[in-house]
């Protein structure tokens, strides 16, 4: 049933819910949820690349509207478009290449800078929006910005449309398939969408073999619910 679960995860373009997987392979939803989290942990294998050439970076916030949450998941003192109930994710994508995503604590310089330095080659040209969290990387990279606040989205080769397109795909999966991704497990969901993007040009069979070659990424049920 593990092989069936892996195949279904990799062949569904937008993801598969634990409820649907439980029906497809005839296990409980609790078991299906655990299997999905284990599989997503392995999908980290395609979320660790080194990005070169032209790279776009951008952050997004993941989280449903507070009014739509179950009572035990509502965030106190959260109103309107406040980000208190949302979790930031940083994305970096090499144009015509791969993407890397990391869940972050905040969108501050101290949080963003070391992650970009870890995954983006120093010789790369980096494109971002005008957010101040990227100011520090001017010291290490050729860094160009577009000012979304002033309605500027494209200035020649300076744009962040590629990474924003990736976020669109992630949000579609969030809204259409999963409905809720807890901050605790969000990195594993990000792994799934990152893997899917980075293997978009290869067959499902190749994806299947790639995952089986990376079962070193493991997590126990006790770790998941801790």
Where are these predicted regions, by residue range?
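Residue-level recognition of single "structural anchor" positions
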Residues: 1-226
